UniProtKB/Swiss-Prot annotation:
GO molecular function: ATP binding; hydroxyethylthiazole kinase activity; magnesium ion binding
ATP-binding recorded as keyword: yes
Chain positions recorded as substrate binding sites: 40, 189
A Pfam family hit: HK
Catalysed reactions, semicolon-separated: 5-(2-hydroxyethyl)-4-methylthiazole + ATP = 4-methyl-5-(2-phosphooxyethyl)-thiazole + ADP + H(+)
Gene from which this protein is expressed: thiM
UniProt keyword list: ATP-binding, Kinase, Magnesium, Metal-binding, Nucleotide-binding, Thiamine biosynthesis, Transferase
Protein name: Hydroxyethylthiazole kinase
Taxonomic source organism: Methanosarcina mazei (strain ATCC BAA-159 / DSM 3647 / Goe1 / Go1 / JCM 11833 / OCM 88) (Methanosarcina frisia)
Pathway this chain belongs to: Cofactor biosynthesis; thiamine diphosphate biosynthesis; 4-methyl-5-(2-phosphoethyl)-thiazole from 5-(2-hydroxyethyl)-4-methylthiazole: step 1/1
Task of the protein: Catalyzes the phosphorylation of the hydroxyl group of 4-methyl-5-beta-hydroxyethylthiazole (THZ).
CDD domains (UniProt xref): THZ_kinase
Length: 261
């Protein structure tokens, strides 16, 4: 898509989140800074109805409960019926059995269009050996690009692996995004924010691989710009919101660092 940010800001898509309690505020604000409209409806009594009026659904399993899983399944079924994109952020997969089982339940019960996680989380979902510490990636034994491509094929979903370099694949096309700054890893929530941004971009671009690639390029570019005037994590977070708010398609497209394999 030529001008995704302009499209988001003109159409103001509603992006429904069922996300974790640690970063919910950050996800809402970054979605709004990009120009989309965030809504966070977790109750099983209303979540499917909220999805029914939304343009994308973002699921984040960072703070799981059994009731939250029920809401996620209800909303994902509604999203599938409406044919809007479903993004699953597989936070902490590999850390506990419950988390692994619930991620597998979601993937086995509903259509997930975009599966996002760090290197360890995606490797675990793909059946590869991986080490994780809580929700942080430590190491994987396989090549990330190969893991993303093969898992995309087997899951029939777009797979997004985030890290120092982000890998995005739909099984046919594979992109490596090199935008970003190390300060993005110094604050809690940038991974969750990335899922919100991916949902926002996917809400206006039916090519979900392209949408995910663009989302990470734009977010990474904002991180690079924010870092220029930041003394540390505190000022960086404030500057990040400002840089996102002031982004333009022309500015980011001149900064894109993306390789198609």
């Amino acid at each position: 898509m030529k001008n995704p940010l302009k499209t988001i800001r003109e159409t103001k898509p509603l992006v429904h989140h069922i996300t974790n309690w640690v970063t919910i505020y950050d996800c809402a604000n970054i979605t709004r800074a990009f120009g989309a409209l965030p809504v966070m409806a977790h109750a099983p009594e209303e979540c499917a109805d909220m999805t029914g009026i939304s343009s994308a659904l973002v699921l984040n399993i960072g703070t799981l409960t059994s009731e939250i899983i029920d809401s996620m399944l209800l909303s994902a079924a509604a999203a599938n019926k409406k044919k809007i994109p479903v993004v699953l952020d597989a936070v902490g997969v590999g850390a506990t059995r419950f988390r692994d089982e619930m991620a597998a339940k979601i993937l086995g019960s509903v259509r997930v269009d975009i599966i996002k996680g760090n290197y360890s989380e995606i490797a675990k979902l793909a059946g590869e050996n991986a080490e994780t510490k809580g929700v942080e990636s430590t190491s994987i034994s396989a090549d990330p690009q190969k893991v993303a491509k093969e898992f995309a094929k087997s899951s029939s979903s777009v797979v997004v692996m985030t890290g120092k370099e982000d890998v995005i694949s739909d099984g046919n096309r594979t992109f490596v995004v090199k935008n970003g700054h190390e300060l993005m890893g110094s604050i809690v929530g940038t991974g969750c924010m990335a899922a919100s941004i991916i949902g926002s971009f996917a809400s206006v671009n039916p090519d979900y691989c392209d949408a995910a690639k663009d989302a990470l390029c734009y977010f990474g570019a904002a991180g690079e710009l924010a870092a220029k005037n930041s003394a540390g994590p505190g000022s960086f977070k404030v500057n990040l919101y400002d840089e996102v708010f002031n982004l333009s398609d022309e500015k980011v497209q001149a900064m894109m660092k993306v390789e198609e394999l």
